[in-house]
Amino acid sequence: MKLNFLVTTVALLVAFPPPYECRAIEGSSNQPATDPDGERQSPPVLARLGEEYFIRLGNRNQNYLRSPADSFPETSQYSKRALQLQLTQRLLEGKVGNIGRLDGNYALRALDSVERERRSEEPPISLDLTFHLLREVLEMARAEQMAQQAHSNRKMMEIFGK
């Protein structure tokens, strides 16, 4: 357990090294904290990107009119990933639809059963073909298993007599 914790800690420290200066932000001090360049550090700012928030450490004199990806180069990959996730979620919602409305509406279940019957009568296409073939293979395997079981039952009846 301790070894797992140690390995995890080392992996996280290697993957996410601490910033150059690791010190607390001096909020109540009268002396402003200065960088070697003479610029004053601002407290962390939450930058909103979609539904996710990113912490930004930087100078208060920066131009806030820039886009989040331009003003925070260290978070550009995170912002791209967040946008990709949002796009994926929207695409999935568009294809699947609102699942919650299907659960609440029992009338649609009857329509779904009618739709399934209609689909079983029609020749399957593309992805449906794969599932159709899989279903038929499973049915054939089940029928073969039942035939073997019936044959073994007949043999047992012949051996032991009725």
Swiss-Prot record:
InterPro entries this protein is in? Corticotropin-releasing_fac_CS, CRF, Urocortin_CRF
One GO cellular-component annotation of the UniProt record comes to: extracellular region
Q: Mark which residues the record calls propeptide.
A: 25-119
- Which residue positions does Phenylalanine amide occur at? 160
The record's subcellular location field reads:
Secreted
Q: Which Pfam families match?
A: CRF
Primary localisation category: secreted
Record family assignment = Belongs to the sauvagine/corticotropin-releasing factor/urotensin I family.
**Stated role:** This hormone from hypothalamus regulates the release of corticotropin from pituitary gland.
Stated name of the protein: Corticoliberin
Recorded name of the encoding gene: crh
